[in-house]
Amino acid sequence: MKALVTGGEGGIGRAIRARLEREGYEVESLDLATGFDVTDPEAWERVEAVHLAFLNAGITTGQMNLRRLEPEQYRRVVAVNVDGVVLGVLRLVRVMKSGSIVATASLAGLTAIPTDAVYTLSKHAIVGFVRSAAPLVKPIRLNAICPGMTDTTMIDSQRPLFDAVGFPLLEPDEVAEAAWLAATSGRTGECWYVQPGREPAPFRFPNVPGPRRDGEAVGRPPLPSEPPS
């Protein structure tokens, strides 16, 4: 059995790889450190079918002040965090006949995180993409995990604050376990929240109020159907 992990050399990526290897998977790490750029469409064209794929590569702007944010910082975060997922899914659904794809979003994909608005934007994009694309790529399953603050190098600049107030952090192994659960649950189109002290579970999104006509509720609009090719 084969699997791939993007961002496989980071803290969460290494933990996911280790979790998969314990299950007997042959795991390929796709990371800048291994010569793979998730933002490059040509790089994705070299990727072949796997049983499980974890699209985990992600970065932050490192900039809390929008007035100081450079356009290049914005573009880089969107390229890695959003393009790195979308390009991966576009390739994988062409070469996989079944199996499971899990994207690493964040709690920042489920709520507002003012400390990094662009990172939050990118993770909301992943959540929206996964929920919308999942019905279109069956029988491949597509889910996201949305971990809270995790003890990796990404939070190094904030670590003194977390330590000072005793804020609990997730361990990478906990996130990896949630990723495995999302991949093997048999569900699709779900966004699993991961928080310290709680069992991972699909987030329940509130329903959007629907339209009304002549005082009566109207159902969903008809959607065009297109058979998978």
Residue spans of the language-model regions?
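C-terminal helical subdomain
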Residues: 144, 161-210, 226-228
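Active-site-adjacent segment of SDR/Rossmann-fold oxidoreductases
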Residues: 95-96, 111, 132-141
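N-terminal Rossmann NAD(P)H-binding glycine-rich loop of SDR-like oxidoreductase domains
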Residues: 9, 17
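Substrate-binding pocket helix/loop in short-chain dehydrogenase/reductase
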Residues: 64-66, 73-75
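Active-site helix of classical SDR
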Residues: 89, 122
